[in-house]
Amino acid sequence: MTISPSKPKSSDVKQDKSAPLSTEELYQINAYWRACNYLALGMIYLQDNPLLKQPLKPGHIKNRLLGHWGSSPGLSFIYVHLNRLIKKYDLDVIYIAGPGHGAPGILGPTYLEGTYSEVYPDKSEDEEGMLKFFKQFSFPGGIGSHCTPETPGSIHEGGELGYSLSHAYGAAFDNPDLIVTAVIGDGEAETGPLATAWHSNKFINPIRDGAVLPILHLNGYKIANPTILARISHEELEDLFKGYGYTPYFVEGHDPAQVHQLMAATLETVILEIKKIQTEARTSGVAKRPRWPMIVLRTPKGWTAPAEIDGHKLEGFWRSHQVPITDVATNPDHLKILEQWMKSYKPEELFDEHGSLIPELKELAPIGHRRISANPVANGGILRKELRLSDFRNNAVEVSKPGAVEVENTKPLGNFLRDIMRNNMTNFRIFGPDETASNRLSAVYEVSEKTWLADILPEDADGSELSTDGRVMEMLSEHNLFGWLEGYLLSGRHGLFHSYEAFAHIVDSMFNQHAKWLEISKNEVAWRSPISSENILLSSTVWRQDNNGFSHQDPGFIDLVTNKSANVTRIYLPPDANCLLSVADHCLRSTNYVNVIVADKQKHLQFLSIEEAIAHCTKGIGIWDWASNDHHGQEPDLPDVIMASCGDVVTMEALAATAILRDEFPDLKVRFINVVDLYKLQPDTEHPHGLSDWDFDSLFTTDKPVIFNFHGYPWLIHKLAYRRTNHENIHVRGYKEKGSINTPLELAINNQVDRFNLVIDVIDRVPKLGSAAVYVRERMKKEIINNRNYAHKHGIDQPEILNWKWPY
């Protein structure tokens, strides 16, 4: 059975029969929109003759035509109508364009309201500036084809689809006066992240937060396909959004004059409804979940384009998605059609002889920071305030002797985060997918509970930690949480995202996009102020997935991070709780980075006092004298072997192996090196944290065997250190996809990061140990067998493993 689209009911839009726009207002708004559409076409097509003062010629056309027309008219249409209400009600509004490929529809208004020329003075508001504005678009040495960081007013590029709505809600949190207009493309609405982001309305508090106004831009088509939501019945579409908890308003049509009136009436209705919801909540002091309004805007794809080209439908069809007419430079008939199309906007009525927007239209835009493109929220670093951080040392673990006391590594961090939240109750939040308690961060609940505006039941009082004004954000969607965090950071605040290590891969692409945004912002957009770093804590790590097994074992997120620019990425693997505190304090103070911290939540041995941890983490890499017996490298006592580690569980196993070696071979000189800052392994020519060759060689020598026990996939160490002098002698152990429901030691044995295999590795690479080493090697093999058999029989490791302490 086929469900056909149906017409909207008359009750869907309560129109003002007198029409909200006067004849003059309608003319002016439409004229402003015509100017936006003219600029959009100019960006796609023109490299000369910007005002069409001459007949259009092939030489005026760019040699390579790039860009997307289809969404641009709808995006600028919304922008123009928002401007009207910003001026009327003095609104604080930012605009997120989900279909960011329709950037011409956003760039045009930013240029017309003057912001673009303010941040890029060479793109002046005259004919010369307009030409530069046109030519730079999707052009080498210019700007990209999306709402990139170079776009004033943008916090969302919209290149990869799916994140506009979560970014919008993130920006609205703790911004009570802000309205975030999130325009969602109907193609984007088919993505998983966007589909779940509709539920964000269960987490917005009308007292302390701003509002999000979702506008579904239903133009019917993607690149070459219809969209699902455009091909279901009106009733089904309406029920969908009612089911999500919204009140949907429909604005539909083709005729610009009619749709202008509908949009003006509807947008004013929903803005007043938002204000009413907020006023009632703030007056009563009671935060309830209202039915927030949203708009479904159904207009043609490529609106105002020619109806057809060569008998093929253009306006209102997928052919208008990108460059609508591709051969204008070589086809005279098509060139004429383009010229007629551009002239249909009557640029001579919109711009004066110098190429400036005429004053009557200029007055339609807001002024100063009320301009969408100049709103400081969209340049969040301007508004960013430093976190008020307590002394993390107050939460330190007492370590009087290395490797003697056990602590859950992330629990002291939870105490530190609790103190941070207490001191920053309007600009700091924690984001995690139902894992705050699991990752041992539940101390934060002493200060603030989980945000929750859906129903709360009586039994929730028994440990559920739910509150309408909580600051801990939990939802079982890594996509949505990460989007919230990014929106929160980009609008000037601070946050931490934590996740089970294996499932950080769910947001691989989101991390990619944010890293790219930071790279451009830092290096190419001087007017963007630094924002707080994106801090990611990966816990419940590969080596201690006691309840879950193989599916939860994947340390590869950090491999992905190393593919991104050294300017914006940092990776830390603290070996114990005090190092984790030091690293977290550093990361939370930083700006314009993605900081990834890998730290397990289970009980582990503690190695460094807080002062030792600070010194070690400040260096990022170093020799642990207390674990070494190479007499500080003094001649002729250079080490026979270097035992290196990076990560918490593998550090303990490397230390246990070192203890065995020192017991079995008292004359063997072992140097123990621990790495916290993974990028120390790269040369300083490749990463600003990298060691110089001299420093690296002084630690790892130029010719001695190095046994490197690594938390993640072993080839990552080779990737980072391949240019080092001693690389051929670096032997790396790490996770090799050998896992199940294992005991901790059994999992280590399966992947050869255990103490016994490490001892064998040393024996195999230090010839001076002689024939006596053969017997030790055999005992190590026997230990591997015995410990595996014990685990299979008893389900736990042997007592001497569970109770092992550093013996020296």
Curated annotation (Swiss-Prot):
Protein name (Swiss-Prot/TrEMBL): Probable phosphoketolase 1
Main enzyme class: lyase
SUPFAM superfamilies for this protein: Thiamin diphosphate-binding fold (THDP-binding) (SSF52518)
Family membership: Belongs to the XFP family.
NCBIfam families reported in the protein's UniProt record: PRK05261.1-2, PRK05261.1-4
Biological processes annotated in GO: carbohydrate metabolic process
GO molecular function (one): aldehyde-lyase activity
Entry superkingdom: Bacteria
Record key words, sorted: Lyase, Thiamine pyrophosphate
Cofactor field: thiamine diphosphate
